[in-house]
Amino acid sequence: MNMKKKEKHAIRKKSIGVASVLVGTLIGFGLLSSKEADASENSVTQSDSASNESKSNDSSSVSAAPKTDDTNVSDTKTSSNTNNGETSVAQNPAQQETTQSALTNATTEETPVTGEATTATNQANTPATTQSSNTNAEELVNQTSNETTSNDTNTVSSVNSPQNSTNAENVSTTQDTSTEATPSNNESAPQSTDASNKDVVNQAVNTSAPRMRAFSLSAVAADAPAAGKDITNQLTNVTVGIDSGDTVYPHQAGYVKLNYGFSVPNSAVKGDTFKITVPKELNLNGVTSTAKVPPIMAGDQVLANGVIDSDGNVIYTFTDYVDTKENVTANITMPAYIDPENVTKTGNVTLTTGIGSTTANKTVLVDYEKYGKFYNLSIKGTIDQIDKTNNTYRQTIYVNPSGDNVIAPVLTGNLKPNTDSNALIDQQNTSIKVYKVDNAADLSESYFVNPENFEDVTNSVNITFPNPNQYKVEFNTPDDQITTPYIVVVNGHIDPNSKGDLALRSTLYGYDSRFVWRSMSWDNEVAFNNGSGSGDGIDKPVVPEQPDEPGEIEPIPEDSDSDPGSDSGSDSNSDSGSDSGSDSTSDSGSDSASDSDSASDSDSASDSDSASDSDSASDSDSASDSDSASDSDSASDSDSASDSDSDNDSDSDSDSDSDSDSDSDSDSDSDSDSDSDSDSDSDSDSDSDSDSDSDSDSDSDSDSDSDSDSDSDSDSDSDSDSDSDSDSDSNSDSDSDSDSDSDSDSDSDSDSDSDSDSDSDSDSDSASDSDSDSDSDSDSDSDSDSDSDSDSDSDSDSDSDSDSDSESDSDSESDSDSDSDSDSDSDSDSDSASDSDSGSDSDSSSDSDSESDSNSDSESGSNNNVVPPNSPKNGTNASNKNEAKDSKEPLPDTGSEDEANTSLIWGLLASIGSLLLFRRKKENKDKK
C-alpha cells in the first residue's frame, strides 16, 4: 500500500514535470514568433514610409493644407504627450528616453481622438512622461530635408482629412483596429489609441524618418539649438548698406547702422541658418558686457533668432514660421560700434559687411578726439563697460596724458552734478587701480588698456573716500609731482533701484609752473541705441570753477563756467612804505629780468605821460662810496633838444667831499651841435670855496669841432666872491686844434646864486666804457613836484666797472618843468682820478643865447699858479702861456712898488679874507 502511494507520487511528480516542460516550450516558441513579427512590421513600415514620401511630393497636397492645420497638430501633440506617458510606464527604464522621442515622431500618423479620450489620458500623465530626449531630438533635426517638409505637410493634411487611405493602409498592415477607429466612435477611441500606440512604439525603436512637426514650441526652446542647413547663399534679393556720416566719434556715442534685406527661399525649414559678416573694426555690444542682436520679427511672431559667434559675425536661425509661410522677406537694422581693441588710433577705416557674396563697404574717419587740457592739467575718461545683470561698470581715466609737469596732483571722482546718476561710490562698492605710463605715446586713443603693459602703482598712491559718493587719489611721488601719464581704472557698482543713468565726473587738481592751484574736469555719460542694450559714453571736457585756496579740493564740484584764458601769478619780495599819487599813461615794450629787494620811504606826486622804446644791454660792476651833504633850492624851467655824438674813454678814481648850498634860477636857450673826440688823463686836487652872485643873459649858437689831447695836473685853491650881471649875445665860429699840457694849482672859494632858464635841443650818440671806483653813503629827504613830458629814443651800449665810496647828505626842494626831446647814442671810455673838497654857495641868474662855431688845434704846456678870481681872464696869464711856450726863460723883472701903504692895504685885505675863509669852513663843518 505504501508502495502504491509511492508509485502514485512518482507518477504525479513525473506528470507535473512533463507539463512544465511543455508549457515552457510553448512560451519560448511564442516569444520567437513575436520577434519575427516585429521585424516584419518594421520592414513594412519603412517601405510604406517611402511610398508616402513619393506620394506626398504632390504640390497640390501642400497647398491644400488649410491654416487650421496648426490647431489639429497641437491636438495631436497633446495626444502624443499623453501616449508617451502611458507607453513609458510599461517600458523598461533603459528604453524610456528613446521611446518618448520615437512616439513623438510617430504620433503624426494617428487619427485624432475624441475630447473624452483626450481628457482621460491627460490625467494619467506623470512628470516623467513630459520629458523629451535631447539626443533623439537632435538626431531628428539633423535628418531634416525638403522631403520631410512635404511629408509633414501631407501628414498635417491627413489629420484634417481622414480620406487619406495611405496612412490607413500603413497602420492596417500591423493592426486592424487602428484602421477601423473613427472620430465619431467614442467607445472605441481609447482602444484604438492604445493599440496604435503599441504598434508605434515598435516602429519607433528603429525608425529614423524625421517628424519635426511633432515638436511643440516650448520643447524646442528647452532643447539645444537645432542644427539645420546653412542657406546663406540661397537667400535672394539681398541688399546690404552701411549708414553713417563721414566721421564717427566713438567717445561721443557715435555708431554705425548696418542695414540688410533679403528674401527667404520657400524650401527653408525650421533650424536653417544664414550668416551676416560683420567687419572686425566693429562690435555689436558697445560698452555692454554681453552683445545681443535683434530677433527678426513677423508681427508678433519670431521669424529668426540671432547669436554672435566667436569671430564676431551674426548667425540667424529660422523658427517654424518658415514652415508654414511662402515668399518670406526680412529686413534687419543693427547698431554697430567702433571696436577699441582693433581700432586704437584716430584715422580712416574701411568697413566691409555682407550676406554671402553680396557686400557693402564704406570708408569713415574714426575720431577719438583729444583729451581736455587747461594750462598744465590734462585729463580724459570713458565708461568702457556696463553689466546690467551684475549692476557693475568700469571707467578708464587718463591722468596727465600730455606728460606735463604737475605739482601736488590730486584726482577726485564723483557723480556728475545736476544729474540723477545711479553710480554708487564708496569703499564697499568701488575698486580703483592705478598704472604708471612711462611714455605718453604708449597710450591708445581708443582707451583700450592692457594692464600687463604698464606698471601697477596702486599700492604707492593714497586712495580715500573723503565724502559721500566721492573718491580721492593722491599721487605720492618722491618729489610730489608727476611728469608722465597715469591710468586710473575704476570698477564700480550701479544702484539697481535708481531710475537715473550712469553719469560721472573726474577732476584733476594741481599747481602749475607759477604755483597757481588749478583744476580740470571731464564728464562721462552713457547713451543706449535702438533697444540693443548697447551704447557708448558722451564725453565733454569741463573747466570747473577754480579753487580759492591752494590745495583745496571741492567735496562735490558743481557746474561752473570759467575763463580758461585766465592766468595770474606773482612772485615778490619787497619792504616798502610809500605814499604816492600818480596819473600816468605809458606805452612801453620792454624785455627785462630783475631780482630786487628794496626798502624805500618816499613822498612823491607825479604826472607823467611817457612813451619809451628802449633796447639796452648793460654790463656793470660798481662799488660806490660817497660822502656828500647838499642843501639846494632850485627852480628850473628848461626846454632842451640836444643832438650829440660823443666818444669818451674815461678812467676815473674819485674821492670827493663836497658841501654846497646853491640857489639857482636859470633860463637858458641853447642850440649846440658838437662833435668831439677827447682822450684825457687828469689828476686834480682842488679845494675851492666860492661865493658868487651872477646874473647873465646869454644867447649863444655854437658849432664846434675840436680834437684835443690834454694831460693836466692841477692843484688849485681859490676863494672867490663874485656878483655878476651879464647879458651877452655872441656868435663865434672857431676852428681850433689844441694840444695842451697843464699843471695848475688853484684854491677857490665861491658863493653863487644863479637863476637860469634854458631851452636846449640835443641829439647825442654816445658809447661809453667807464671804470670807476666809488663809495657812497647817502641819506636823502626829498620833496619833489615834477611835471614832465618826455619822448626819448635811446640806444646805448655801456660797459662800466666802477667802485665808488660816497657819503652824502642832501636836502633839496626842487620845482622843475621840463620838456625834453633827446636822441642819444653814446660810447664813452673814461679813466679819471679826482680828489676834491669843495664848498660852494651860489646864487646865479643867467640868460644866455650863444652861437659859436669853433675849430681849434692847439698844443700848449703850462705851469701856473692861479691868481684870485678877480684877475682878468685875458690878461697876463694868456701872454704867460704864449711866452712860456716860445721860451723857457724866466719872466722879466718888472720891478716892485715900495709904497708902504699899498703893502699894508693888501696885508689887511689878506687877513680879512683869511678870517672869512676860515670862518666859512668852520660853518660848513658845523653844518656837516
Curated annotation (Swiss-Prot):
Compositionally biased region (Acidic residues): 546-564, 598-856
Signal peptide annotation: 1-39
Low complexity composition bias: residue spans: 47-65, 117-131, 142-161, 565-597, 857-875
Gene3D superfamilies cross-referenced by the UniProt entry: 2.60.40.1280, 2.60.40.1290
Record's keyword terms, sorted: Cell wall, Peptidoglycan-anchor, Secreted, Signal, Virulence
Motif LPXTG sorting signal, residue range(s) on this chain: 891-895
Entry-annotated residues carrying Pentaglycyl murein peptidoglycan amidated threonine: 894
GO BP of this protein: cell adhesion
A Gene Ontology term for the protein's cellular component: extracellular region
Residue intervals passing through the bilayer: none
Membership in a protein family: Belongs to the serine-aspartate repeat-containing protein (SDr) family.
Function recorded in the entry: Cell surface-associated protein implicated in virulence. Promotes bacterial attachment exclusively to the gamma-chain of human fibrinogen. Induces formation of bacterial clumps.
Identification of the protein by name: Clumping factor A
Taxonomic lineage from the root: Bacteria, Bacillati, Bacillota, Bacilli, Bacillales
